[in-house]
């Protein structure tokens, strides 16, 4: 007997997004790195299935599991605001394969200045693409803004790494291994706000509970961007803090000293082990669809809401991005 899918809401989350565990399960699903390998035609099929489900025209014989799988592919590859297919490298599902390579090499090649500069540049190039790909698309970003953001973040990361390398020359070796994390954290504090500065200037689009646009709020933008910065630093922290401790001990073992050529691949592999868990955990720290009390909004926006709605509106909602 076929399941009745006429009332199936494909946009309803499978897990409770009001709880941390529910959000982690959700992001484990859509940041699955295996989806990066899914062919384009299958992604296009997923989009068609999602759109048909939204219109209530699901093909006969379709199973619920097929719709869940289609939604997983759709969420992993298509932007939540525009519905456009995102570039592969910028998708959150590419965070594990892309991040593990860059993190592993940043942690391995931290001693020489050219290596530090090169890998910080690679990392910031990757971050800039991810930030742009996962931005709140309701707030357009100009090419000039992207360029300024990219240059500023890269300069910050390199300056932090180079400066701390010089300061830690006489410090214990382990301290020097933590320099890449300090550079990454500092750059995230610059890169994300700079890339999304338009939202801070003009405000982020806020909606009512029925998804009707109300206006734009700079305060909401500041909250959303701050949460994204915290999430990104949290994503990198365990691997970039604990791996140096582990490698510092492993490199004292004789058999590890004999195979120095494998040190970098080992750090890449271990970085992947951390990221495969930390990407969904960090993304799930805060709800993607944020809820904000109207009383926190700008006074003029509060007045607009009071004039537009007869009944009191307690909260507004907005997509904070990833």
Curated annotation (Swiss-Prot):
One of its GO terms (biological process) is mitochondrial transmembrane transport. This is Sideroflexin-2. Keywords: Acetylation, Amino-acid transport, Membrane, Mitochondrion, Mitochondrion inner membrane, Mitochondrion outer membrane, Transmembrane, Transmembrane helix, Transport. Pfam families: SFXNs. Belongs to the sideroflexin family. It comes from Bos taurus. It is found in: Mitochondrion inner membrane; Mitochondrion outer membrane. The chain crosses the membrane at residues 100-122, 142-164, 174-192, 228-250, 265-287. It catalyses: L-serine(in) = L-serine(out). InterPro entries: Mtc (IPR004686). The gene is SFXN2. It is a multi-pass membrane protein. PANTHER family: SIDEROFLEXIN, SIDEROFLEXIN-2. Mitochondrial amino-acid transporter that mediates transport of serine into mitochondria. Involved in mitochondrial iron homeostasis by regulating heme biosynthesis. Its main location: mitochondrion. The modification N-acetylmethionine is found at residue 1. One of its GO terms (cellular component) is mitochondrial inner membrane. One of its GO terms (molecular function) is transmembrane transporter activity.
């Amino acid at each position: 007997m076929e399941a009745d899918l006429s009332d199936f809401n494909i946009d309803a989350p499978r897990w409770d997004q009001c709880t941390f565990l529910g959000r982690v399960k959700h992001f484990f699903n859509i940041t699955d790195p295996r989806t990066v390998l899914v062919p384009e035609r299958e992604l296009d099929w997923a989009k068609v299935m999602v759109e048909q489900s939204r219109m209530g025209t699901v093909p006969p014989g379709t199973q619920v599991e097929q719709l869940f799988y289609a939604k997983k592919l759709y969420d992993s590859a298509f932007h939540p605001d525009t519905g456009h297919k995102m570039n592969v490298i910028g998708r959150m599902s590419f965070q594990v394969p892309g991040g593990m390579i860059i993190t592993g090499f940043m942690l391995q090649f931290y001693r020489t200045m050219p290596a530090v500069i090169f890998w910080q540049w690679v990392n910031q190039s990757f971050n800039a693409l991810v930030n742009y790909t996962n931005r709140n698309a309701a707030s357009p970003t100009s090419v000039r803004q992207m360029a300024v953001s990219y240059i500023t973040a890269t300069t910050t990361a390199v300056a932090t790494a180079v400066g701390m390398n010089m300061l830690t020359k006489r410090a214990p070796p382990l301290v020097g291994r933590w320099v890449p994390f300090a550079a990454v954290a500092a750059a995230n504090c610059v890169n994300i706000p700079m890339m999304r500065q338009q939202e801070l200037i003009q405000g982020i689009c806020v909606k009512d509970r029925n998804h009707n646009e109300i206006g734009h709020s700079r305060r909401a933008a500041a909250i959303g961007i701050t949460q994204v910065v915290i999430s990104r630093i949290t994503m990198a922290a365990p691997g970039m803090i604990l791996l140096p401790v582990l490698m510092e001990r492993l490199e004292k073992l004789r058999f590890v000293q004999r195979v120095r050529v494998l040190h970098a691949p080992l750090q890449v592999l271990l970085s992947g082990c951390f990221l495969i868990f930390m990407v969904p955990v960090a993304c799930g720290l805060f709800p993607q669809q944020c809820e904000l009390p109207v009383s926190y909004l700008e006074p003029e926006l509060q007045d607009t809401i009071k004039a537009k709605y007869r009944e009191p509106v307690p909260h507004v909602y907005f997509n904070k991005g990833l």
